[in-house]
Structure formats: C-alpha cells, structure tokens
Amino acid sequence: MPFYKKIHFSDKIIVYLWKNSETYEELLRKVYLKDQSLDRLKSMRSESHRKSFLGVRMLLEYCGYTDYDLSYDISGKPFLNSKNNEIPLVISISHSYEFSAIALSKEAIGLDIEKIKEKVLRIAPRYMNMAHIENLSKKEQIQKAVTIWGIKESIFKIKNETGISFPDHIFEETFDLQDNHCKAQLRFNNQVEDFNINFCMIEDYILVCAFRSY
C-alpha cells in the first residue's frame, strides 16, 4: 500500500505521507470525488499533478475524511468542514513529484515538501541569505537551500497575505541540518510573528512543517 509514513512533529501536529507509486487509473478507482474536484482533475495536463491530487484524497480517506470534507477559501487555502458541530482540524497540503502530504493540527500550520535538486542553488540568492550555506559541501548547500525554501513556503501558507516577500519578510535563525528544527520570524506590516519549524529528510525530499511560537 502506498501509504508511506505518519510523523508526529508534536502532540498537536501529525503529518501523513503518500507515495504515488500506483497508476493514475488505479488511484482514480479508489477515491470518491465531488463534481468540482473531478472537473479540476480533468483540467490538469500533467499526470504527475493528477496523481498528487489523488494522493492527497487517499490520505484524507486514510484519516477518516473524504474529498467532500475538503474545501478552499477565496485565496485557495484548504480547510476541513466541521463534523458533528466539532471544531474542524486545520489542514495544510503539499506535494512534489512522488509524494503527497497533509498535516493535521488544532492550530495554524504550514507544510511543504520539496525534492532535493541541484538547480535550487541557481535561484537561492533570490529568496535567502547565502551566508547560511557558506562553508558547506555542495551536497549540504543544496539540502539546506531546499530546507530554507520549505521554511519560507510553510510560513507563507500560514499567513497567506499578498505582499509577503520571502527574502524581505521571512527570516530563519541559523541552524544545522542535523538539528531537524529551528525558529523563524515573519516581519510584515509592522508586526513580528515567531514560528517553530520542524524538518526532516524523506528519501531525496525535504519535509518542512511550520507553526506559531507562543
């Protein structure tokens, strides 16, 4: 079964991973989709994107939900509809190539999974302080640059406001890849917000989860 792993980043945050090793047709037969989702699926040109989309729905079903429980707000941010008048869990979604991932929590969270690719070094100066990867081997530079992108992307998913700039507004503290956690700040609109970050390597991917630090 392509369910890959469940990760407890804290007692409040659980991440679920699905490895998209099945064919698109096999996945499609296994999930129940509302008409809106089916139309969206058909509009996707890439089979990889279609499989990732279905992988997320497989994870929802693994967690006791269905596609019918998932909605998106006007900005495209996902949320789970409440069940039996309960306060719904917060959800964050990410996917990259082989993997689909969701995070469920009772508090605001942002999740990102990224494939480790050398080309990240070409764009890294656009979104990060390159001093963070000085004096590292090339392999470590690539891994850390991908991690920092994931940190910024995860925080952006929580805040999700127009005008936020990765290099100008989101700042991560110095960390080592072996730490698997760090802290970061969003400095935007004359406010400073602190975030805790957890990250880990999954095969040749980096998984990052952000949540507010109180």
Specify the residue positions occupied by each region the protein language model found.
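Core catalytic alpha/beta fold that binds nucleotide/phospho-ligands
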Residues: 1-214
